[in-house]
A protein has these predicted regions:
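Residues lining the SAM
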Residues: 102-104
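Conserved class I S-adenosyl-L-methionine
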Residues: 1-41
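SAM-dependent methyltransferase
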Residues: 113, 133-204
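Class I SAM-dependent methyltransferase SAM/SAH-binding core
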Residues: 44-89
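A short glycine-rich, Lys/Arg-flanked "PGG" loop and its adjoining helix->strand segment in the class I
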Residues: 116-128
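C-terminal lobe and adjacent flexible extensions of AdoMet/dcAdoMet transferase-like proteins
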Residues: 200-239
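A short acidic, Gly/Pro-enriched loop at the edge of an enzyme's catalytic core
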Residues: 91-98
Length: 239
């Protein structure tokens, strides 16, 4: 499943701290030139990059997510470029001083080999001293918070059930059912997606192999990372 099913409700459901994340990574870059936002979703973070002074390209695998992002850009009178692509088979054209991915985008990279290739492509696409910044849910969160849990959201226009289950180590499958209000009844839509979780040391090793200097922090507090951190924030600078 792509995120098409959730596109119209994504911002309401996720409630992600984009402001906090932007403030956390802002000291690592100079806001000029081109930025590439991978797995950009509805474009909230991309708009922040645009407002900061970047010329921004948004990449996402969901056409409906990109449609929502384009609506936001028009409303904000911002010119962004939108491209549909899967991060697992991504081709990057051009050069960027900043490449980002927020809110678990890289949790959809399906293998360590794909992750290694992606980091290599990003390194090649960055300008000298360019920065890659991304955040992911940790393996600790997958095993201790997500696995076996059911989440529920009820609003006047829709009801959503979200059940996560462990498929194997480092791999969580999520069943999603959305009941959308239509007249006197509801229309049901179902979906399923898989997320992939890697050890923090794996990200560090693969990034360093591709030529990055790497800094980790907690992706929720933006302080020091610890073994029970639910989110990992990575700022990696091209050597």
């Amino acid at each position: 499943m792509s995120y098409d099913l959730l596109s119209e409700r994504y911002d309401e459901l996720v409630r992600f701290d984009y402001d906090g994340l932007f403030a956390a990574i802002k000291p690592s870059f100079v806001p000029s030139g081109a930025a590439l936002d991978l797995c950009s979703g509805t474009g909230t973070f991309a708009l922040k990059l645009s407002e900061a002074g970047f010329k921004v390209t948004c990449v996402d695998n969901s056409p409906k997510m990109l449609t929502e992002a384009a609506k936001k850009a028009r409303a904000a009178r911002r010119q962004l470029l939108f491209l549909q692509a899967d991060v697992n088979s991504l081709k990057i054209y051009g050069k960027y001083s900043l490449i980002t991915s927020t809110c678990d985008g890289f949790n959809y990279v399906k293998s360590e080999e794909n992750l290694k290739k992606l980091f290599g492509k990003i390194h090649d696409a960055l300008t000298e001293n360019g920065v890659l910044a991304f955040d992911v849910s940790t393996l600790y969160k997958a095993e201790n918070v997500l696995s076996g849990q059911t989440f529920f959201e009820d609003t006047p226009t829709y009801t959503l059930f979200w059940t996560a289950r462990k498929i194997e180590d480092g791999k969580i499958g999520t069943d999603v059912s959305v009941f959308k209000k239509e007249g006197d009844g509801y229309k049901r839509e179902d979906g399923f997606f898989v997320q992939y979780f890697y050890r923090n040391e794996t990200y560090k090793r693969l990034l360093e192999q591709q030529g990055f200097d790497v800094k980790f922090s907690d992706g929720e507090t933006y302080g020091d990372l610890n073994e029970k951190s639910n989110r990992l924030l990575v700022v990696a600078r091209k050597k």
